[in-house]
Swiss-Prot record:
Cysteine pairs bridged by disulfides in the record: C139-C205, C181-C233, C193-C235
Gene source species: Tropidechis carinatus
Region (Disordered): 47-69
Protein name: Venom nerve growth factor 4
Main location: secreted
Pfam families referenced in this protein's UniProt entry, alphabetically: NGF
Record bears the keyword Signal: yes
Tissue expression pattern: Expressed by the venom gland.
UniProt similarity note: Belongs to the NGF-beta family.
UniProt cross-references to PROSITE patterns, sorted A to Z: NGF_1, NGF_2
Cell compartment(s), UniProt: Secreted
GO cellular component terms attached to this protein's record: axon; dendrite; extracellular space; synaptic vesicle
GO biological process, one term: negative regulation of neuron apoptotic process
Length: 244
């Protein structure tokens, strides 16, 4: 009987010694530790995915300067387009810098400085007659280089005029030399021409236009078109019929 009791007690102690240890004392690499590491890695990966999705949904706002530079850089012109240019006008100018206010003694067809299209200057002289002192213009006019964004083409349609172009990684502006009446008056009676006999003629000064070939936008492509610009201030005379 005593031997049986001793045997049962020894078996009970052996069972207690062979019981599994707690998770707090589990060594690295055990199944319990692997489950914990996999769970933490999954949570970290999920956090990274959430952060990336948030950045994609809410991109960082661009600066206004970057947007302006990007819009200017989008209008890229092929240099071959200028080789096909015909009917060049002295009133159309492409330049990286503002042109002089007056053309002076030269009529510039295409302004090229050291950093321009062909690195040369093509100009022609204008022959100005010698004016005597005391001679006056019939109508006073004013001329200046201007930048146009829209204009009327030869078909009467309003077209978009290219203000800036990107050529060989440089930005050029398109200028137009316009001439118009200095003091335009919609009432012909109050804008009589100088030196016209008002007893025989009704006269008034008005601005006239002509067509020049300019670079315009047609859809997403640049193309040459004839557009109207102001080019002169002339005198219009009408014979009075009351005297006849």
């Amino acid at each position: 009987m005593s031997m049986l009791c001793y045997t049962l007690i020894i078996a009970f102690l052996i069972g207690i010694w062979a019981a599994p240890k707690s998770e707090d004392n589990v060594p690295l690499g055990s199944p319990a530790t692997s489950d914990l590491s996999d769970t933490s890695c999954a949570q970290t990966h999920e956090g990274l995915k959430t952060s990336r999705n948030t950045d994609q949904r809410h991109p960082a706002p661009k600066k206004a300067e970057d947007q302006e530079l990007g819009s200017a850089a989008n209008i890229i012109v092929d240099p071959k387009l200028f080789q096909k240019r015909r009917f060049q006008s002295s009133r159309v100018l492409f330049s990286t810098q503002p042109p002089p206010l007056s053309r002076g003694e030269q009529s510039v067809e295409f302004l090229d400085n050291e950093d321009t299209l062909n690195r040369n200057i093509r100009a022609k002289r204008e022959n100005h007659p010698v004016h005597n002192q005391g001679e006056h213009s019939v109508c006073d006019s004013v001329s200046d280089w201007v930048i146009k964004t829209t204009a009327t083409d030869i078909r009467g349609n309003v077209v978009t005029v290219m203000e800036d172009i990107n050529l060989n990684n440089e930005v050029y502006k398109q200028y137009f030399f316009e001439t118009k009446c200095r003091n335009p008056n919609p009432n012909p009676v109050q804008s009589e021409c100088r030196g016209i006999d008002s007893r025989l003629w009704n006269s008034y000064c008005t601005t006239t236009q002509t067509f020049v070939r300019a670079l315009t936008m047609e859809g997403n492509q640049a193309s040459w078109r004839f557009i109207r610009i102001d080019t002169a201030c002339v005198c219009v005379i009408i014979r009075k019929t009351d005297n006849f």
